[in-house]
């Protein structure tokens, strides 16, 4: 296995099922060695024939596929060379593309309104403070604390805001404005109401707190604050089928910080009241896998409602794996949709809730799309199967051990070479902690194992997956208990 094998892997992301349940659209991304960039295409798969029927592709990135009610595909075309970000519409049956809207700066989180009359997205403002200054090549002027991001890079003094494009009138409107970021939002199922996740406090750069506002009129920026939470890490929000309730994942205990579990909350919009429906379920919900690799656009990991209004679907973080569940909002009864030994980091389903599409990774396969229907589960992609076979990539060994009387899980990618009568070993202690270390694909783990190094990593205390006490254990003991767990893992394996 060589480092350049990384260019041969295909990254699968963001599956979306059409409204009639007949088609799946997803992105497939490759790293181009020739052009030193990423290129993405949208693949359209027909469920009935089990065949790929079309690919939306060019020399750039085509991503964020979103189906409208007419089985047309709204998507984003990114041409960074020309600073062009175009929202386009692909007519499936005519195999025809139309330009809807162009922007000169990056946009994200594209959605279609429930009434189908609007397209929305998030976009960072221009950083005017550093726009025309003579010193801009030498000096960075800042008036906000959060001027960079681990995922986005440099954002400067910009704030992320919500824009809505009126398809009937061909007009674009900036819905929110001010010194705050919109971190998540959702359209109501009927009409054109929006719920947003933000923090409008003047000290928002220094707070984990998130607020939820309800926008009932797109022509007025005054919003109706519904409630707030001490933390919402995922920033995903959903309306109930009748639009009376919202669901989010988060916690409301300030002293827990980012160690608190992301529990599921039900919010009554009219009464502005919230209730935690998973208070007695010791699980964090959403995708919080933190050691994944070869994930580019990700997938839908938010709470989704059943059409009956009494149940929701949610991803759960448990002992290094992520499962898809159904939860009754009245009884809090939770049940898995199917059993799996993988990391599910995206899912969608059809309107009849008969077909469940999941995006999954394992320790020797970065991503595949599965369909679960009528009790049967099958893989519908497999773009890396031949490469995985040729490289002979092995699954990691799962190892359970104890430290301080606590059960901890870890994984080992075994190397098979001996150097000078010794077997070299690499122990990854992870970052954070926070989130959950999972039994998922990491290119460098496989690469080092092929080079003869045994590679180890574990879900030490401070992470999700083993309950809230486990996650809170290192609060005030950061660098102590988590390091102790890693060393105990090493000693246990060596012994």
PLM regions with names:
Residues 83-117, 122-154, 159:
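Asp-box/WD-like beta-propeller blade repeats and closely related beta-sheet repeat scaffolds
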């Amino acid at each position: 296995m060589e480092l350049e094998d990384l260019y041969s892997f295909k990254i699968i992301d963001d599956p979306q099922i059409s409204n009639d349940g007949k088609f799946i659209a997803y992105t497939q991304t490759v790293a181009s060695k020739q052009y030193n960039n990423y290129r993405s295409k949208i693949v359209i798969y027909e469920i009935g024939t089990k065949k790929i029927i079309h690919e939306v592709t060019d020399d750039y990135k085509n991503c964020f596929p979103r189906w409208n009610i007419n089985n047309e595909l709204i998507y984003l075309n990114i041409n960074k060379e020309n600073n062009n970000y175009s929202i386009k519409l692909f007519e499936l049956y005519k195999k025809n593309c139309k330009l809807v809207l162009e922007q000169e700066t990056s946009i994200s989180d594209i959605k279609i309104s429930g009434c189908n009359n609007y397209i929305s997205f998030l976009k960072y403002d221009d950083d005017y403070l550093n726009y025309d200054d003579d010193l801009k090549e030498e000096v960075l002027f800042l008036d906000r604390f959060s001027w960079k991001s681990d995922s986005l890079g440099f954002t400067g003094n910009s704030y992320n805001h919500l824009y809505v494009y009126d398809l009937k009138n061909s007009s674009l409107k900036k819905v929110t404005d001010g010194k705050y970021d919109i971190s998540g939002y959702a359209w109501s199922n009927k009409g054109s109401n929006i719920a947003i996740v933000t923090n409008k406090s003047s000290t928002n750069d220094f707070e984990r707190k998130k607020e939820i506002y309800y926008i009932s009129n797109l022509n007025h920026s005054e919003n109706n604050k519904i409630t707030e939470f001490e933390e919402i890490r995922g920033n995903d929000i959903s309306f109930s089928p009748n639009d009376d309730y919202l669901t989010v994942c988060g916690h409301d205990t300030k002293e827990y910080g980012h160690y608190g579990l992301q529990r599921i909350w039900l919010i009554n919009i009219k009464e502005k009241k919230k209730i935690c429906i998973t208070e007695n379920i010791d699980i964090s919900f959403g995708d919080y896998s933190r050691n994944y690799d070869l994930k580019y656009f990700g997938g839908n990991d938010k709470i989704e409602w059943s059409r009956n209004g009494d149940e929701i679907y949610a991803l759960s973080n448990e002992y290094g794996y992520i499962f898809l569940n159904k939860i009754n909002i009245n009884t809090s009864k939770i049940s898995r949709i199917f059993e799996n030994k993988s990391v599910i980091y995206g899912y969608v389903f059809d309107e009849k809730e008969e077909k469940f599409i999941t995006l999954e990774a394992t320790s020797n396969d970065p991503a595949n799309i599965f369909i679960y229907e009528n009790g049967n589960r099958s893989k519908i992609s497999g773009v890396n199967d031949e490469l995985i076979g040729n490289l002979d990539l092995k699954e990691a060994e799962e190892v359970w051990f104890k430290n301080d009387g606590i059960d901890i899980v870890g994984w080992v990618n075994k190397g098979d070479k001996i150097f000078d009568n010794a077997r070299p070993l690499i122990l990854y202690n992870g970052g954070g902690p926070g989130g959950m270390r999972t039994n998922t694909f990491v290119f460098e783990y496989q690469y080092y194992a092929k080079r003869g190094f045994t590679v180890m990593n574990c879900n030490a205390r401070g992470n999700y997956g083993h309950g809230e006490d486990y996650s809170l254990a290192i609060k005030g003991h950061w660098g102590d208990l988590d390091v102790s767990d890693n060393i105990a893992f090493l000693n246990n394996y060596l012994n």
